[in-house]
């Protein structure tokens, strides 16, 4: 199987968590695109979706799936999203697609976070994938200096602006042994909107696509 086929297998497995009448939280990225396409086949059974990005919202709407405002709902049973890396404690690096802030908001609201990815994303220690940090534009230089101070090598994502009108710097060279502590530390830097560590709110269920099939792992 190709990597894309593995992504699709994980995404289709997540449809088992979608119940009749449910509002579904939808993430962003290539794996989630497969989930959205699968969701289209059962769109008559759901009440709609909450999207973590404009790109996912457009894909949902193209399939005729209603996209709802998060502020207009009181309960979000499930959120389905991918990860750039996920460790054994279900802490993740996310934000390769630049939607980390909205992803983190929707994940915080959801009762259950289903992470869908292929086996290459499972790691022993986070940090090989550069950590995205969303920053207010006027704070870019200051935030970059602070990131260097803690041992990172920040690189501006050239030509990219988030759905919120901000910049992304990707931080290389971090071996993240304490993801919860680092998530908090980075978010305390003035000018940082949020960072791509999903540790304080990690995944509840991991659907990990391997050549032998999709493994279902549940957080302790």
Swiss-Prot record:
Class of this enzyme: isomerase
Keywords noted in UniProt: Isomerase
Keyword Isomerase carried by entry: yes
Binding site for substrate: 28-31, 81-84, 94-97, 121
UniProt family annotation: Belongs to the ribose 5-phosphate isomerase family.
Assembly and interaction partners: Homodimer.
This protein's name: Ribose-5-phosphate isomerase A
Biological source species: Aromatoleum aromaticum (strain DSM 19018 / LMG 30748 / EbN1)
